A protein has these predicted regions:
Chain B
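Membrane-embedded beta-strand positions of outer-membrane beta-barrel proteins
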Residues: 41-43, 94, 130, 170, ...
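Transmembrane beta-strands of outer-membrane beta-barrel pores
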Residues: 45-51, 85-89, 98-102, 134-136, ...
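Repeated loop/turn-to-beta-strand initiation elements of outer-membrane beta-barrel proteins
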Residues: 88-93, 125-128, 177-183, 216-223, ...
Length: 242, 432
């Protein structure tokens, strides 16, 4: 009898959340954030507790689910430095050093709260499986679990707008559910070409109390790119694609 | 602690200045407009204080006829300029390096073109370069035994830009789906004639080098060769791979045919031996949860000297010095100086070395502050150098570094016979 009651309750309250296809929703969130292949400009701002800022400007290209590359345009001390990500592989090229070196996703080439995985973000669906979805009013909460151990954050709690299917907030967690950082998506803007998405991403972290990092997007547009642009050999030349 | 205070003070000072102009986060898209040209570079000043080891062989070799006391000051300044001009598929790039040095020898001023080449990019798969450039082959951080077409880098400053050679090279890249994601081929021609690359090796030769790069099963793999006569034929391979999100491994192997080694015994008799030399490097980079990065490398230098050969060399210098003190005749010391240049005098001239660098990102909650410590151990004779440094890059385009080096070793050992016991330097570098 108790089992039958439980079954009725599950049917009444459980089905609505499981009825949502989490994987399809996550893929939709990815596509709403940006086209599968695109170019964009970004400004990264690291803000210290006293309000002091340090800014970086990057040109970024992405192709498919797992290829992304960026080159620093400013400040002068960083100009020409480029980063490349192919799936779990990441490299950093410094013109003076003259050769790409492998870096890891948890490091940060710019300091501040954003790490390399944040700066070279792939599609969420490329790195995470959807464990479950909850619908709370006009908001979805997607519980994401990393597909492999090489992904920077083991778990994500992705809060998505129920209508626009765009992320509002993402909590990045360790395997033990410890909060590493929170990413906020703000200022939805029409970039043209059907791309309407948040133009500002902010992040803070209990590990960096008082610090904040901000990423502002500009000139985001779909672009067809050759696979060869996403190779180590091409890293010194990424700026030629601008 | 004093440093922490100093950096905190600087942070506060510049913080006040930027607060005065605090504003909302804006991104002016005019910043992203592309110009066909670029001019930039950096200027730096670097005063150095050396603590001399007056009993060391290399001190005697350099200062036998002068007394510079127990410390030596040196004032260095560098201006590195780079410029590029881009039009269509063509790009011209030049990087020059001007060094000013004021030392016990007086003033010295030298400008070198580190790189200057024309690059043509007819497609995203093909790039062709002609001119002076550095190739920087190899995966090692401190050493690169497979960098056959580069000048040797200084393991104490592995990130400094180096002067290149005049070459003609191409890069052909192809990408695939599947376990083999990328393959690229880099053929290189290195002419060596009078006034053209004449420090590379024997002159009047046209040398050919090449590199095949594969990204296979998430592993970078290079196969490398050099032949042509200026240097003996040599082959190499290297690899690099991320094991986890915070752990990377890399390695290099070089096989040099008929390597010619010139060495002296303690009497000063010169010997030449020829053999196939095998050099190797294995290393790792590891990032801890507390944001400390460790770089560990073991280097087997197949072209290096044994402990006995090195002791003979130092003993010969000491003999030359004793002769000079007794008779005023410096002929033996001059012979020792001749055999030092490019041979015993190259960085890490012996056989087995261990390199460890630990750098901690932003401790004490000071953003952009990175303290590091680097140790290089000569495994054969247990002599070593230890270099702590503090880097602060919190002010846009300005990099401040305080670095010290302490070396230790028994008499007739690699580091024990260096001319300095210690070194302290401050470097301020401004990028523009």
């Amino acid at each position: 009898m108790r089992h039958a009651v439980a079954l009725v309750f599950m049917m009444l309250f459980g089905i609505p959340s499981y009825a949502i296809d989490g994987t399809a929703l996550l893929k939709e969130v990815d596509r709403n954030l940006n086209p599968e292949s695109y170019e964009s400009y970004r400004k990264l701002i690291n803000v210290e507790p006293d309000g002091r800022k340090k800014e970086y400007t990057l040109f970024t290209i992405k192709k498919g689910m797992d290829k992304v590359s960026s080159v620093f345009l400013a400040p002068a001390s960083e100009k020409g430095r480029s980063t490349l990500r192919l799936g779990d592989n990441m490299w950093f090229y410094i013109p003076n050093v003259g050769k790409p070196i492998r870096i890891t996703s948890l490091q940060s080439v710019v300091g501040g709260v954003f790490n390399n995985a944040d700066i070279l973000q792939l599609d969420y669906a490329a790195e995470y499986n959807v464990e479950r979805v909850e619908q709370n009013g006009n908001e979805y909460l997607l519980y994401l679990k990393a597909k492999t151990k090489t992904v920077a954050y083991d778990r994500l709690k992705l809060y998505a707008d129920g209508k626009k299917h765009l992320p509002v907030k993402i909590e990045c967690l360790t395997e033990a559910n410890m909060l590493i950082k929170t990413i906020y998506f703000k200022d939805v803007k029409d970039f043209g070409g059907g791309i309407v998405r948040p133009s500002v991403i902010e992040t803070d972290s209990p590990l960096y109390k008082g610090y904040k990092s901000v990423m502002i997007f500009a000139k985001l547009k779909a672009r067809i790119l050759k696979d060869e642009a996403f190779t180590l050999t091409y890293m010194p030349n990424i700026e030629s694609l601008r | 602690m004093v440093l922490v205070f100093l950096f905190s003070f600087l942070s506060s000072l510049f913080g006040v200045l930027s607060l005065a102009t605090a504003e909302e986060y804006t991104f002016d898209v005019s910043e992203t407009e592309k110009k066909p040209y670029h001019i930039g570079g950096y200027a730096e000043i670097r005063p150095v204080l050396f603590g001399l080891d007056r009993d060391a062989s290399l001190y005697k070799l350099k200062f036998y006829n002068r007394d510079e006391g127990s410390t030596l000051e040196e004032y260095n300044a560098t201006l590195q300029l780079e410029g590029s001009l881009e039009k269509g598929i063509a790009r011209l790039f030049v990087r020059t390096n001007t060094d000013y040095k004021n030392s016990y020898l007086g003033e010295d001023f030298e400008t070198t073109v580190h790189e200057g080449f024309l690059s043509l990019k007819p497609s995203s798969s093909l790039t062709m370069d002609v001119g002076k450039k550095t190739l920087k082959w190899g995966k090692g951080y401190a050493w690169n035994p497979v960098a056959f077409v580069d000048r040797p880098k200084d393991p104490d400053e592995p990130e400094l830009s180096l002067e290149g050679f005049i070459v003609a090279s191409a890069d052909y890249i192809k990408s695939f789906q599947g376990p083999l994601k990328t393959i690229s081929f880099t053929p290189v021609l290195i002419p060596v004639y009078n006034h053209v690359n004449d420090t590379f090796g024997d002159i009047n030769k046209l040398n050919i080098a090449g590199k095949i790069y594969l990204l296979l099963y998430d592993t970078d793999i290079d196969f490398i060769f050099l032949t042509g006569g200026s240097k003996t034929t040599r082959y190499g391979m290297d690899f690099s791979r991320n094991i986890t999100t915070n752990f990377e491994i890399h390695g290099e192997f070089a096989y040099i045919y008929n390597y010619k080694k010139i060495f002296v015994n303690s009497d000063g008799s010169t010997f030449v031996t020829q053999y196939d030399a095998k050099s190797a490097l294995i290393g790792m980079r590891y990032l801890t949860e507390k944001d400390t990065t460790y770089i560990l490398e073991y280097y087997r230098n197949g072209t290096g000297f044994s402990s006995t050969e090195m002791r003979d060399y130092f003993s010969f210098i000491n003999k030359g010095y004793d002769t000079y003190v007794a008779t005023g005749n410096d002929a033996l010391l001059k012979k020792a100086a001749n055999i030092t240049a490019g041979n015993y005098g190259r960085p890490n001239a012996m056989r087995d070395y261990l390199y460890l660098r630990a750098s901690r990102k932003e401790p004490f909650d000071i953003l952009y502050f990175t303290p590091s410590i680097t140790g290089i151990l000569n495994i054969s004779d247990k002599s070593f150098s230890l270099s702590p440094e503090f880097l602060y890059a919190g002010i846009t385009n300005l990099e401040l570094r305080l670095k010290a080096s302490f070396i230790s070793g028994e008499r007739l050992s690699d580091y024990g016979e260096k001319q300095n016991d210690s070194r302290v330097e401050i470097r301020a570098r401004y990028y523009f």
